[in-house]
């Protein structure tokens, strides 16, 4: 029997990484919000790797933080180890990667949700979405409780009709032994949404006491920890190392000889898998010329013996997993605590969404996270934040927040999903960013914090911290060209020691800092008027902005061209089948996606440059016609 149990502005279904951010954003913007999880002990569950960040993902985390989200703050509070990746490369691809205590991460996020004003969290399985006149009006729990709402955000991750496969054994399940959400998947289909079936896999966890680390290569954290959150100046903890080992020909032979027992190869798994996170059987079969593959052994927490075997994702039966482990140096006697498994699940075709992550089909219904066909905690959290923000802004009667491709990786992620869709689990990559030199992890606050403040998500404390940094940077960038450096013996000895050419005449410090061998901090002795309180993060900005000035200016000019196309808006009521000259494929794709700008239309697969030219002419004629009609009236 159904009954009214409560009424809220926003209901969030699922409290993983997307759901947690969505619920917090909505509540922090003043909306009465309720979040549902099938198990409150699994909030922000790290069902796969116990880490946050990495290339492109770190940029997302920093952007979430700059807008006032929680992931970076929670990562810093749960840290085991921090490493900066790609340090030998340019700043565009440098990325933080944090190893975290996964249980502490969950506990900290639950603690944050429980104490958030305007937010209730409840343990319940949602089985139906109530819709009236194409508008969402509520959700229903398995026990019959109805929660009325003005907006609903679906963030169900891999739970929709989840099915776990380990070798010959397959059974209905969510990740990590949790219950799947079967009825909700059917409810979403009944509303008319097109569904897809994807899969992902996770490696075994082994007992630390059975691992021989003497046969592995230690992977320590950075000597000085760089916090993920802009709110934290420093973190001082005892870091726990990760370890590196390799597969070998023995490993590969076992896999080749038993490939008929891998469900990912036998057809037992029907979902489409992750391209950039392949199973070990995939790696061995697709790259036969490789004589070894990296295996990272990573801690899952400070107070557990479980170790995560990164690189050994698999759907093989447990006996074969044990045999494979026995061939790897250091893991010969490792005891499995949790076997590897593959999980397949339902997700929606994301082209059914607007750029706000609201569905085109049902007003007030939003989707975010892996249910949109993405992979990764960071991608999920970014979508959750944006869905929470936009659901709240819609209810408050305010304009939506849509970040474009030149503003943030978040903008690229959402634009790719709603414009191009995906036929496999989507992962964020730096190569997807056209303007990655200006979308760095180090400048996310400069790009987005003022936007976060404007919508009301950034706290006064965060904003004041940001302003101090911004003012310091602006003052230094103006002061440095006025500081003259003379070709003294001391100066030239310093330059020679750095592998740089000695000076023959005076030069300003701004120009000197353009040299790749010279960094801002090392020139303090040349600069007597330099303030003593310059932040490390400001020093980093100075070096990057000066050294890459030419490239940054070039990219900013490209952004201007991009913006020009984005600013050419397309009327909502346009009938593409009436646009003569468009190819049939373009008519079909444009009618399905309903792009809001010519720029977005140009990124749709199947829409050619010739189609865009036709569309531009049509829009010009349309505007002229409407202008003439307005004059007559």
UniProtKB/Swiss-Prot annotation:
It is found in: Cytoplasm. GO terms for cellular component: cytosol. It comes from the Bacteria. FAD binds at residues 14-19. Belongs to the MnmG family. NAD-binding protein involved in the addition of a carboxymethylaminomethyl (cmnm) group at the wobble position (U34) of certain tRNAs, forming tRNA-cmnm(5)s(2)U34. This is tRNA uridine 5-carboxymethylaminomethyl modification enzyme MnmG 2. The lineage of its organism: Bacteria, Bacillati, Bacillota, Clostridia, Thermoanaerobacterales.
């Amino acid at each position: 029997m159904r009954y009214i149990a409560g009424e809220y502005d926003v209901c969030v279904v699922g409290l993983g990484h997307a759901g947690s951010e969505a619920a917090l954003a909505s509540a922090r913007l003043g909306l009465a919000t309720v979040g549902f999880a099938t198990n409150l002990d699994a909030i922000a569950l790290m069902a796969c790797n116990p880490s946050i960040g990495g290339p492109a993902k770190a940029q997302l985390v920093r952007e979430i933080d700059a807008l006032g989200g929680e992931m970076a703050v929670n990562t810093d509070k749960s840290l085991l180890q921090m490493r900066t990746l790609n340090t030998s490369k340019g700043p565009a691809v440098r990325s933080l990667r944090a190893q975290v205590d996964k249980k502490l991460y969950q506990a900290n996020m639950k603690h944050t949700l429980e104490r958030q004003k305007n937010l209730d969290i409840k343990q319940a399985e949602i089985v139906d979405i109530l819709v009236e006149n194409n508008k969402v009006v509520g959700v229903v729990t398995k026990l019959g409780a109805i929660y009325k709402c003005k907006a609903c955000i679906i963030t169900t991750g891999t739970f929709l009709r989840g099915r776990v496969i380990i070798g010959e054994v397959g059974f209905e399940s969510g990740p990590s032994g949790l219950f799947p959400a079967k009825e909700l998947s059917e409810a979403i289909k009944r509303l008319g949404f097109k569904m897809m079936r994807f899969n992902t896999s996770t490696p075994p966890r082994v007992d630390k006491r059975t691992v021989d680390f003497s046969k592995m290569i230690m992977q320590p954290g950075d000597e000085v920890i760089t916090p993920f959150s802009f709110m934290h100046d420093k973190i001082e903890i005892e870091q726990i190392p990760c370890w590196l080992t390799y597969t070998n020909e023995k490993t590969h032979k076992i896999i080749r000889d038993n490939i008929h027992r891998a469900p990912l190869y036998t057809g037992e798994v029907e979902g489409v898998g992750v391209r950039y996170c392949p199973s070990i059987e995939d790696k061995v079969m697709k790259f036969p010329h490789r004589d070894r593959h990296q295996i990272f052994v990573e801690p899952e927490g400070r107070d557990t013996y479980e170790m995560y075997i990164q690189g050994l994702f698999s759907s093989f039966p447990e006996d074969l997993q044990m045999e494979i482990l026995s061939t790897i140096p250091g893991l010969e006697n490792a005891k499995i605590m949790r076997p590897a498994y593959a999980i397949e699940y339902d997700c929606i075709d994301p082209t059914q969404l607007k750029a706000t992550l609201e569905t085109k089909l049902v007003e007030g219904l939003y989707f975010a996270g892996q249910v949109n066909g993405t992979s990764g905690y960071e991608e999920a959290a970014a979508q959750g934040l944006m869905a929470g923000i936009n659901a709240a802004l819609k209810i408050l009667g305010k304009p939506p927040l849509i970040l474009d491709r030149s503003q943030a990786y978040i903008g690229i992620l959402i634009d790719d999903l709603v414009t191009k869709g995906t036929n496999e689990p989507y992962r964020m990559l730096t190569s997807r960013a056209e303007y990655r030199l200006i979308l760095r992890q180090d400048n996310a606050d400069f790009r987005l914090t003022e936007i976060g403040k404007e919508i009301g998500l950034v706290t006064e404390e965060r904003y004041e911290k940001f302003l101090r940094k911004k003012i310091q940077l602006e003052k230094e960038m103006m002061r440095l060209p006025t500081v003259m450096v003379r070709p003294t013996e001391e100066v030239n000895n310093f330059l020679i020691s750095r592998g740089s050419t000695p000076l023959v005449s005076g030069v300003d410090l701004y120009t000197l800092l353009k040299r790749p061998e010279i960094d801002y901090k090392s020139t303090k002795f040349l600069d007597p008027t330099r303030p003593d309180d310059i932040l490390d993060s400001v020093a980093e900005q100075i070096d990057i902005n000066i050294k890459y000035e030419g490239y940054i200016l070039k990219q900013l000019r490209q952004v201007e061209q991009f913006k020009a196309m984005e600013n050419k808006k397309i009327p909502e009521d346009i009938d593409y089948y009436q646009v003569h000259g468009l190819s049939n494929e373009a008519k079909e794709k444009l009618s399905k996606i309903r792009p809001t700008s010519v720029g977005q239309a140009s990124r749709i697969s199947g829409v050619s440059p010739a189609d865009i030219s036709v569309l531009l002419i049509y829009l010009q004629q349309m505007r002229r016609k409407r202008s003439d009609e307005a004059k007559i009236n």
